UniProtKB/Swiss-Prot annotation:
Annotated protein name in UniProt: Phosphomannomutase
Role summary: Involved in the synthesis of the GDP-mannose and dolichol-phosphate-mannose required for a number of critical mannosyl transfer reactions such as folding and glycosylation of secretory proteins in the ER lumen.
NCBIfam families: HAD-SF-IIB (TIGR01484)
Membrane-spanning residues: none
Outcome recorded upon mutating I234T: In strain: CLIB 556 haplotype Ha1
Record-stated family: Belongs to the eukaryotic PMM family.
Organism annotation: Saccharomyces cerevisiae (strain ATCC 204508 / S288c)
InterPro entries the UniProt entry points to: HAD-like_sf, HAD-SF_hydro_IIB, HAD_sf, PMM, PMM_cap
EC top class named in words: isomerase
Length: 254
């Protein structure tokens, strides 16, 4: 633990990590003033960080332009892009790991499958290529908030994403990939081990005695599951940002 950097905190050996969508913000929407104030209070007591599957630009939209200064740790794409006290750490690349030939086969299968799904609505950006993963959305990431809510209800009834994931697992069993359903409208595809637990390697040297994690998709198959059940963390399952504030207030006497 670096005394000089974190000694001012009441609990410098405690780290609290947060998922973004559904935990700090409503899905794809911006953070509320109540959550911001709660996090500011919490940061005086212990170290805080966020870890999400989206790239940093989307997290800046949701959490604000000063997010790198307001969190001790900032983990985009599950920690493949990482910042500690505003300074960038080493990153990884999905395409370099998988290779162009395999990625082409994967992308062609995904696009063909997307074209054959029976859906009431389609919008745009069905396959999003990121540094550390790809994100697949049957309705498309350009869907409005209302359309996202509609798809989420439709998906719960028809299991569109779950069936899609099973088809991918069957088609590419030897690719070493993980398929993780998260948010309302999409799922992530990334190398095994590149889930949210990936970010924990960035904090190992700081010697935290307690690492708490707050997330909403903590069920098996959800994109918070692996870090939620990891033996290195104390997991907290939440239903909404309001729920996050409530638990934090009680747990840390804010």
């Amino acid at each position: 633990m670096s005394i000089a950097e974190f000694a001012y905190k009441e609990k410098p050996e405690t780290l609290v990590l947060f998922d973004v969508d559904g935990t700090l913000t409503p899905a794809r929407l911006t953070v509320s003033e109540e959550v911001r104030k709660t996090l500011a209070k919490l940061r005086n007591k212990c170290c805080i960080g966020f870890v999400g599957g989206s790239d940093l630009s989307k997290q800046l939209e949701q959490l604000g332009p000063n997010v790198l200064d307001e969190f001790d740790y900032s983990f985009s794409e599950n920690g493949l892009t990482a910042y500690r006290l505003g300074k960038e750490l080493a990153s990884q690349s999905f395409i370099n790991w998988l290779g162009e030939e395999k990625y082409n086969k994967l992308a062609v299968f995904i696009l063909r499958y997307l074209s054959e799904i029976d859906l009431p609505k389609r919008r745009g950006t069905f396959l999003e290529f990121r540094n550390g993963m790809i994100n697949v959305s049957p309705i498309g990431r350009n869907a409005s908030t209302e359309e996202r809510n509609e798809f989420e209800r439709y998906d719960k009834e028809h299991q569109i994403r779950a069936k899609f994931v099973e088809a991918l697992k069957k088609e590419f069993p030897d690719y070493g990939l993980t398929f993780s359903i998260g948010g309302q409208i999409s799922f992530d595809v990334f190398p095994a081990g590149w889930d949210k637990t990936y970010c924990l390697q960035h904090v190992e040297k700081d010697g935290f005695k307690e690492i708490h994690f707050f997330g909403d998709k903590t069920m098996v198959g959800g994109n918070d599951y692996e870090i939620f059940v990891d033996e290195r963390t104390i997991g907290h399952s939440v239903q909404s940002p309001d729920d996050t504030v409530k638990i934090l207030t009680e747990l840390f006497n804010l």
